[in-house]
């Protein structure tokens, strides 16, 4: 398995770790942003990270029926993990603000499912995907991602399996530190 340091070096090498002023999908502000699409543009390096994450998932979960990834960020990572674990992989996408299964995908009742994302910050997308799983009578056995930046403060109750844990402070718009407020978005 790749070490945290080697994984972080790959993020830096692929210019996936950006610095500046960013508004995250959660609406929170941050001085750093992880653009996993940059990592994924280097398939050999992305495969190394995904292989290491897949090994962690395999160690923790013995019975996986299906991998579910939220579009857009989780699709390629979900596919790569599914390939490595030899598991069916599907994705859900937002329609009118709600995650939905389309394109003929379905979730079988009783299936044991792992939700895989690129980056988890607040856990909002994962929790929304969870509802889709439980509404279909399936069971979420775990969550996994390339980068966990929750610092243990997400709405996800289970331990997240990740390749990289990064604590990057986030701020509400009305509580920005001066140094961040001076950087234009």
Where are these regions (language model features)?
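Adenylate-forming
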Residues: 67, 184-185
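A contiguous pocket-lining binding segment that forms or flanks enzyme active sites
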Residues: 106-139, 144-145
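Short glycine-rich phosphate-binding loop at a beta-alpha junction
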Residues: 62-71
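PRPP-dependent phosphoribosyltransferase catalytic core
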Residues: 4-10, 130-183
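Short, glycine/charge-rich flexible loops or terminal/linker lids adjacent to PRPP-binding catalytic cores
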Residues: 72, 77-114, 122-124
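Short, well-ordered alpha-helices that flank and scaffold nucleotide-derived cofactor binding pockets
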Residues: 55, 59, 79, 83, ...
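Active-site-facing substrate-recognition patch
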Residues: 1-60
């Amino acid at each position: 398995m790749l070490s945290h340091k080697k994984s972080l070096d790959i993020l830096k090498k692929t210019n996936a770790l950006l610095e500046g002023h960013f508004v995250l999908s959660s609406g929170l502000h941050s001085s750093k942003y992880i653009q996993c699409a940059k990592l994924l543009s280097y398939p050999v390096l992305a495969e190394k990270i995904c292989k290491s994450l897949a090994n962690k998932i395999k160690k923790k979960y013995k019975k996986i029926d299906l991998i579910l990834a939220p579009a857009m960020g989780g699709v390629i990572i979900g596919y790569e993990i599914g390939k490595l674990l030899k598991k069916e992989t599907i994705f859900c996408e937002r329609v009118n603000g709600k995650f939905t299964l389309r394109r003929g995908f379905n979730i079988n009742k009783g299936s044991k499912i792992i939700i895989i994302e690129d980056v988890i910050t607040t856990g909002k997308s994962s929790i929304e995907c969870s509802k889709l799983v439980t509404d279909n009578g399936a069971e979420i056995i775990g969550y996994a991602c390339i980068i966990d930046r929750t610092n243990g403060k997400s709405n996800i109750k289970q331990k997240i399996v990740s390749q990289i844990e990064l604590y990057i402070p986030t701020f509400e718009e009305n509580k920005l530190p001066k140094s961040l407020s001076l950087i234009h978005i």
